Design a protein with these regions (language model features):
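Eukaryotic intrinsically disordered, low-complexity regulatory linkers and tails enriched in Ser/Thr/Pro
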Residues: 1-92, 96-150
Length: 150
């Protein structure tokens, strides 16, 4: 059975055809690709990865590297570091990121809400843009829910 992305998931990291999962209190490797995990989780929540990509693109106007909604009720939104077709693409759960910054080695450091840190060899501006897109998507979803109650 594929890994179920949940509120304790911090990040999904590629290891060839396997995936390293970072969770709140443990890290482990699963024998499945990131794309298969994400696709399965999208299907469990009533869509497909392509459907989620189109939905995100429509809501925030970003067609390249859009954030992906995994579970709208639990506010699980994935942030990709690259195109999902790139084998080096890492995925982060927006709600579990406390902060991120550029260190003295010019690497992006992501600090999660459990104080765990992950250093990435990425452009800070690109990562910042991805986080902002995901935040915009979350805000759009929240606004849509709020309008239902008015």
């Amino acid at each position: 059975m594929p890994y179920i992305i949940n509120d304790k998931t911090l990040a999904l990291l590629p290891l060839g055809k396997k995936t390293k999962i970072l969770e709140w209190d443990k890290d482990f490797i699963v024998e499945e690709s990131i794309i298969n995990i994400i696709e399965h989780n999208c299907i469990l929540n009533g869509s497909t990865l392509e459907g989620r990509r189109k939905g995100s693109s429509y809501l925030i106007g970003a067609s390249y590297k859009p954030p992906i909604i995994i579970d709208e009720m639990k506010r699980i939104i994935l942030i990709p570091t690259h195109s999902n077709k790139n084998p080096n693409c890492k995925w982060f759960i927006l709600d579990n990121i406390l902060k991120y910054y550029l260190n003295t080695s010019n690497k992006v450091v992501v600090m999660f809400k459990n104080n765990q840190k992950l250093e990435l060899d990425l452009c800070y501006a690109n990562f910042d843009k991805q986080v902002l897109r995901a935040t915009r998507l979350e805000s759009s979803l929240r606004g849509r829910k709020y309008k239902k109650f008015l």
